Amino acid sequence: EIIRPTAFFKSLSGQIDRVKKGKSFLIFGNGELTSCKPISARDLSKFIIPLVTRSQSENKIHIIGGPGPPISPKRQAELLFELCKKEKKITHISPKLFLVITYALIPLSIVSKKIRDLREFLKIAYYYATESMLFWDEKIGSYSSNKTPEYGNESLEEYYKKILKNDVVYKELKDQKLF
């Protein structure tokens, strides 16, 4: 069994501190290039337990999202500014910047493992900045939020509220700061 959540709440929380400090929210492209249906760790655990405890495996990929409509980075930014009661400031960054830097670092990557690792991170960042984390519908050749299975009842908005009230221990994120 492969369980593929569309996104985790934590992975969409990297810019909370920026917004709380009144800084701009970083968005790739127009902020509508990608979307996902994030799921909480608790809801995902409840989804996984019956799969791993059953007697026979189905040997399939389980794409799973949280409840409700998909959220784009633009909507995520709007939600955070609203919850933090801050003026909306958004900085748009071209996702192609990841590719430009990746290619510019090729010569240095020959002699440096750190640079090779950085190039790999930039490739992954480009993917996440340009591809939705939803069900890929082969018939229509695009992502489908309608066909992305939903599970649970915890929302990203409620998670953000808990972080902002300090009801959830929120640790500094490293790689998630862009998302």
Q: Model-derived features: where do they sit?
A:
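Oxidoreductase cofactor-interface core, primarily capturing Rossmann-like NAD(P)-dependent enzymes
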Residues: E1-K86
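Secondary-structure boundary/capping signal
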Residues: K23-S24, K88, S109, R116
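Residue-level detector of short coil/turn "hinge" positions at structural boundaries
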Residues: E87-K88, Y170
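General small-molecule cofactor/ligand-binding pocket signal
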Residues: K89-I93
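A hydrophobic C-terminal alpha-helical subdomain
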Residues: K96-F179
